[in-house]
Every structure is written in C-alpha cells, then in structure tokens.
Amino acid sequence: MNKMQEGDLFSFQLNNSNKYGLIQIISKQNDVYKVRVFEKVFSCLTNDEIDSIINSQDFYYLKRFYENDLIKYGKYIGNFSIPSFVSFPQYLRSSERKVNGKLVWYIFNSTTGAVVKTLNKFDKSLEKLSPNRTWGIEYIKLRWQEGFTLS
C-alpha cells in the first residue's frame, strides 16, 4: 500500500451493486496491515465475501476527516489482515470543506501524495477517478448538502 497510516479508511463496493463496506487501517506488522472491517447498514456480506474483498486489490482511499461519521453508521464486522503489497490506482480524488464553507476537490498522486489539481466545483473528469462508486462521492455530497462540517 502507498503511504498508509493508522486510521486511514478505504471503501469497497460489493459486486458492482449498491452494497458498500469500510476498512480502517489499525497497524502494520511485518508485511501485513491489520484492519477493521465495517459494513454499511444495508450491506449483506458473508465471511467468504469478506475474505474475497480483503484479498483483492479493489480498495479506495477515503479522506480521513469524516472517518468517525462513517464508522458511527457502519456495522463492525471484525479485524482482519491484508498484505502490504495491495496497491491503489495512481490518481485518486479527495475533498474537504474549508473554514469559509467552500467545498474543494483534489486530485492527488497516490504514490507521492502530491496534489496535482485542485477544483472548486465537482467536475465530470473527477468521475473517472477513484473512489468512483464508493461512499466517497455520493455520501459526502449528500452530507455537505445537509450542512455537514468538520466539527
């Protein structure tokens, strides 16, 4: 994984449906990341599906600032291990709400962590970047429309 830190979050989509899950990094031990796995309330994951997801490379980075909110509404499944060689797409997107209330989107390089583009409004080009069909986009847009803030 690229530049992973404790507390970082990832989401996954199950079988191209509207079922989502959440993975949080707990620690790194040797060549393995210890993670907590949560599922969205409407998700239905079996142990086999969980193992399949954890051993795949379909993880997407989610901005850390709303981790507590996601976990609050997720159902805790258990702790698991994933290999540290799991990789991510080169370019990812994240976003944050500024102190003045403005929403800003970032495109960043997952290898270097450098922001390569900043947008003041959601642009169609962002749809092609991960996380695409994850909580990262629709969930956060909805929450911001409801007045969600960092505090």
Regions inferred by a protein language model and the residue ranges of each:
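Basic/aromatic-rich interaction segments and small domains that mediate binding to polyanionic partners
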Residues: K28-I50
